[in-house]
Amino acid sequence: PATGKLWPTNYSSGGGMSYTGSMKNVYYALQKSYNTIPALLCKELGRIEIYNFATNNLGLELVQNDQDYAPLSVGALTYGVSITNLVNAYMVYGNGGYYSKAHIISKVESGDGTLVYSGGTDYNQAVDEETSTVMNKLLQNVVKQGTATAAKITASDGTKIPIAGKTGTTSD
């Protein structure tokens, strides 16, 4: 029901909550973890299309109740997602757009070199390579100068290692 309250709000550095609905720059919104832009995008692109993309392309295990705007745009999912499920979804952007379930063991060979086990080789194109490249740049910017700067890593020789990340806020 309509309450007249602006939604969703964003945590602000001053410690309170604020509404930032006029901003339309996705690059900056992701960098600063603004909730309003995903909500606007969800409305614009269509919640069913986003739900289908999340479940079919990224392999997220969502329930029917998650087809609403709050779950899809700000992550207020009915049951949440497991860390493995989330890793699988984000791996798409590090795999050139291909989805594959995370695995630790890719193959096992016997002492004489005979293949005993081979796994984790099913890959599906989830997004095109250009999209995965753009998403990587967006997520790297979150670490470079956004809300995840604490995750920056510098090698012993001073080289800055590119890290992609995403932060979120919750009251739970």
Feature map (PLM): residue ranges:
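A penicillin-recognizing enzyme superfamily signal
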Residues: 28, 79-172
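A generic secondary-structure signal for well-formed alpha-helical elements
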Residues: 45, 49, 54-58, 62, ...
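Preference for short coil/turn "hinge" residues that link or interrupt alpha-helices
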Residues: 23, 35-38, 65-67, 74-77, ...
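Structural recognition of the beta-strand scaffold that forms the well-ordered cores
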Residues: 28-31, 38-42, 53, 62-64, ...
